[in-house]
């Protein structure tokens, strides 16, 4: 990827883009007009500034393309930076510290406090400070890389034109060689339940509650549900998650890991009702909410009363008023934009990436697609191995995985072997008094090649990147087992699990 950057930056400086046979059609550099003009000419126009959009815009500019990024919100960064990944991680981290201090954890380490008090306003302030710094950072990167930022609601008004409607009703027209749709996703509504972001909230409202609820019900025990539910459970709420499926952690999680994960969360005080569906919710005169539930297969109805109801049943692609219908670009049955392997829609110069196309709705997946997509516009190779895209649940302990689960391997009829290592036998986890969880490695029986890695425990979100690298390069379990890992570190558990998978036995367990 770096070599492509050097080649195209060099060509851009020498004005040779029009000689690239696979590049943008008619890509001679065109001077960009200022904001005061009615029209902007560009080579690439990105609609959306979330992880996929802003990264794609910067990469396009670095490749020498005249780039515009249209964003409907006042701040850059999309859902992830403003009301998703970033603020939730701030609350997850700080609520974990509070939980340690308020419970017996600190005392067991010899740290004694006479009084531990939660200042929720201060916690929210720290979250907002982090968000502001990062969104401002994107604005700085745009300026540094000469990406033109247009604040307005972007609509494709022609195969070579985007019109941004601003808050004041004014419009900015961009004539562009290529268009990249990176508009992300929005919260999936629950039929019959109206979200007011006050007491019936989506993930957005759950990040900004004014006080800790006495009782909270979470609809959905997937990634977002367990993350946000655990935040408020740690801060003192009585939290119950109602999940239609028979496990926690969402789609893709290994079932053995999921069961252990659920057990640990329950030990912390998080409650679950699995194989259960929500049939409705009613606000009472005292402000509380009655949530009606019953077994997923049907059965006796039950009512749970709560102060706050959090709806976390997933997200759906955001393609509203993009102008796709007028262009003849149809959506698939799940509302996604169909694209080919180069991320092109049925109109070759209109591309789409991230949550609006097929695949997991992950920020890092969108970032990778954004980079690869614009490199493809410039004539570069386009390839992503989606089997090597990791997933992380940022609770404590964390859960992370990449590659195949045991259930997937069984379904596909692939013969495999398993290597496991518990954090209870890891010296660093022991010294940290943080020993819940394990590392589980799945290797191909005939070749020893790593097929999947599943981690439940401290630092899982960092450790999984070593596993992703191993899968990307087709490493064997023995390859990893023979790599010297620093001692004492948590990642030694990853090596030990690969020892167990390759040789049938780990050293320290």
From Swiss-Prot:
Active-site residues, Swiss-Prot/TrEMBL: 487
Subcellular location: Mitochondrion matrix; Nucleus; Cell projection, Cilium, Flagellum; Cytoplasmic vesicle, Secretory vesicle, Acrosome
GO CC terms: acrosomal vesicle; mitochondrial matrix; mitochondrion; motile cilium; nucleus; oxoglutarate dehydrogenase complex
Location of N6-acetyllysine modifications: 66, 104, 122, 132, 143, 346, 410, 417, 420, 505
UniProt cofactor note: Binds 1 FAD per subunit.
Phosphoserine modifications at: 285, 297, 502
Main enzyme class: oxidoreductase
Role description: Lipoamide dehydrogenase is a component of the glycine cleavage system as well as an E3 component of three alpha-ketoacid dehydrogenase complexes (pyruvate-, alpha-ketoglutarate-, and branched-chain amino acid-dehydrogenase complex). The 2-oxoglutarate dehydrogenase complex is mainly active in the mitochondrion. A fraction of the 2-oxoglutarate dehydrogenase complex also localizes in the nucleus and is required for lysine succinylation of histones: associates with KAT2A on chromatin and provides succinyl-CoA to histone succinyltransferase KAT2A.
Quaternary assembly: Homodimer. Part of the multimeric pyruvate dehydrogenase complex that contains multiple copies of pyruvate dehydrogenase (subunits PDHA (PDHA1 or PDHA2) and PDHB, E1), dihydrolipoamide acetyltransferase (DLAT, E2) and lipoamide dehydrogenase (DLD, E3). These subunits are bound to an inner core composed of about 48 DLAT and 12 PDHX molecules (by non covalent bonds). The 2-oxoglutarate dehydrogenase complex is composed of OGDH (2-oxoglutarate dehydrogenase; E1), DLST (dihydrolipoamide succinyltransferase; E2), DLD (dihydrolipoamide dehydrogenase; E3) and the assembly factor KGD4.
Name of the featured protein: Dihydrolipoyl dehydrogenase, mitochondrial
